[in-house]
Each structure stands twice: as structure tokens, then as C-alpha cells.
Design a protein with these regions (language model features):
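Short intrinsically disordered coil segments
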Residues: 163-169, 208-210
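Short, surface-exposed beta-strand/loop micro-motifs that present aromatic residues
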Residues: 169, 176-189
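Short, gly/Ser/Thr-rich active-site loops of penicillin-recognizing serine hydrolases
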Residues: 116, 129-136, 154-159, 199-274
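Hydrophobic beta-strand positions
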Residues: 15, 181-182, 222
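Short, surface-exposed loop or secondary-structure junction motifs
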Residues: 1-165
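Residues that act as N-cap/strand-start positions at coil-to-secondary-structure junctions
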Residues: 164, 174-176
Length: 274
């Protein structure tokens, strides 16, 4: 059984609306977006910003006969999550678990607002990394989950947070390829926004697995009946983790150098060397 579910976030939306007498969209706009200066985060993208949306999520699946079926019905700037659509995201009803469009700047503003206690108190922020799952009998572990986030934990098989980060660190991944990492102790934040599904194959029938081609860089593509190739996203998560690990490693090293070179002249030298 997978302990992860987004149903809790959907239920939390209803609780928030009942307690505050506000729509969930109104609540997070006032309590999060404005406090974090998130000016480019929208449930319904304004028409003047549509061209800035990165993709339409034209994802594909391969059927048993090798036919590739691509979803071209998704309009740029509209949700593709089926549960979000069912709840009414395209009509302006915030689902609670998905459906918002944002930018890297807004997401870093959000992460920094968390660290700087503009949204939550330090106690509440730290409590997000209290594991709600993970412990098993005989000193064994499963994946650690906190308050709708993935946590740092001992077993490398289930590792979700880069080891050198503090024990209060947490990570929130997105199905479409995004990832937000927050370390409130070391004050390190990282956001990755990448199209895991757009113009890629995310599901292949077992009969067609032999038609997967792997190159020298371990990049997988699927050979279509006409001989052309289409990228397969099955290894996307692994590739993203390599990128995230390198970026966080650089951030930690840079932070260490800041402690060694305490003056601006010294850090200017470090920046020049990099």
C-alpha cells in the first residue's frame, strides 16, 4: 500500500472553507500569495499571460499494437489533472491538491516566505517535517511523509531529501515534473520546473517494451512504426534527482564558503572562480 495520497489535501480544502467562510482560492490568495509576493500564480491564467505558459501537456501512451495515442485536448493554461477538473478547477474552483500555474520566481518567493516565517510560525514550519509514516517493526523503514511533504529519512532506498540537508528539510514533488526543496535550518531552497510529460511517452504497453531504444547516456526513446523516435519519461525522476543533488551540493558548498570568507571581497573572489 502506498501511503501517499492527495485526498487529504482535497479534504483540507473543504475544512478551510468551512472554518474561514472563504473560498479556498480566496483564502490562499490572501494568506499565501499576497504574503509571499506571488504575483504570477493563478488558478485561471489571465489571457495576457497565456503565452508565458510553458506547455500544453501533450503526453502520449503506446498501445499494444505500437500505436501512439497523444492527448491533444489540453488547452494551454488549463489543468490536466483529472481530479482537479472533476472538482471544477477550469471554472475557478480550487481543488486543494493541484491546478495552479506558477513561475520559478513565485515558487522561490513561496519557499523563502516559509523560511522567513511570513506564512507559518517556526514551530508550524518545523512540524511539517515530523514523520506521520515511515516507522515499521524490527527497525525497518518505509518512505517518510510529513504534512503533505516528503521527508529526510535513514533508508537510501526511500530517500527523498538530499542527505547533507538538515533533518527539518522537506521536499514536495509534482506529477508533471516539478520539485520544491526547503531546508529551514540551513535556509536553502530549490525549485525545479520541468515538463516530465509534455511531448513525451509516459505509458507503454508491455508488448512494445522491446521497441524502447536506450542510448549511451541512458536516454530512452520509443521507436514509432514510421521509424521516428519519441522520448520516454520513465527515467525522468532519476535524471531530475541528479540535477537536484548537484544544485543542492553547490548551494551547501557556497554557503560553507560564505562562512569562511566573511567579507564581500572574499566572496567576490569565490564568485569569480565559479
Amino acid at each position: 500500500m502506498n501511503a501517499y495520497t492527495d485526498m487529504g489535501a482535497m479534504i483540507l480544502r473543504i475544512v478551510v472553507e468551512k472554518v474561514t467562510n472563504m473560498s479556498f482560492n480566496e483564502f490562499i490568495t490572501e494568506m499565501i500569495f499576497k504574503k509571499a509576493n506571488m504575483v504570477d500564480t493563478h488558478l485561471i491564467v489571465p489571457s495576457e499571460k497565456i503565452e508565458r505558459v510553458a506547455n500544453e501537456n501533450f503526453s502520449s501512451i503506446v498501445l499494444s499494437d505500437g500505436t501512439v495515442k497523444t492527448n491533444y485536448n489540453n488547452v494551454k493554461g488549463t489543468q490536466h489533472d483529472p481530479k482537479a477538473i472533476a472538482i471544477g478547477a477550469k471554472s475557478g474552483i480550487a481543488p486543494g491538491h493541484a491546478g495552479y500555474f506558477s513561475t520559478k520566481n513565485d515558487m522561490i518567493n513561496f519557499a523563502n516566505a516559509l523560511i522567513n516565517e511570513k506564512i507559518l510560525t517556526k514551530e508550524s514550519l518545523y512540524s511539517m517535517s515530523d514523520t506521520e509514516t515511515g516507522f515499521k517493526d524490527n527497525d525497518k523503514y518505509a518512505r517518510f511523509y510529513g504534512s503533505l511533504v516528503f521527508l529526510k529519512q535513514p533508508d537510501p532506498e526511500f530517500l527523498s531529501v538530499y542527505p547533507p540537508l538538515s533533518g527539518k528539510s522537506f521536499m514536495s514533488p509534482g506529477f508533471a515534473g516539478t520539485q520544491l526543496v526547503v531546508d529551514p535550518i540551513n535556509k536553502i531552497t530549490l525549485f525545479v520546473g520541468a515538463p516530465r510529460l509534455h511531448n513525451r511517452i509516459y505509458q507503454i504497453h508491455k508488448n512494445q517494451i522491446p521497441n524502447i531504444k536506450i542510448d549511451s547516456h541512458n536516454m530512452k526513446t520509443f521507436i514509432l512504426p514510421d521509424g521516428s523516435e519519441k522520448i520516454v519519461c520513465s527515467d525522468y525522476t532519476k535524471a531530475k534527482e541528479v540535477l537536484v543533488t548537484l544544485a543542492l551540493d553547490l548551494a551547501i558548498q557556497y554557503q560553507l564558503l560564505e562562512k569562511i570568507f566573511t567579507n564581500e571581497k572574499g566572496m567576490h573572489l569565490v564568485r569569480e572562480l565559479n
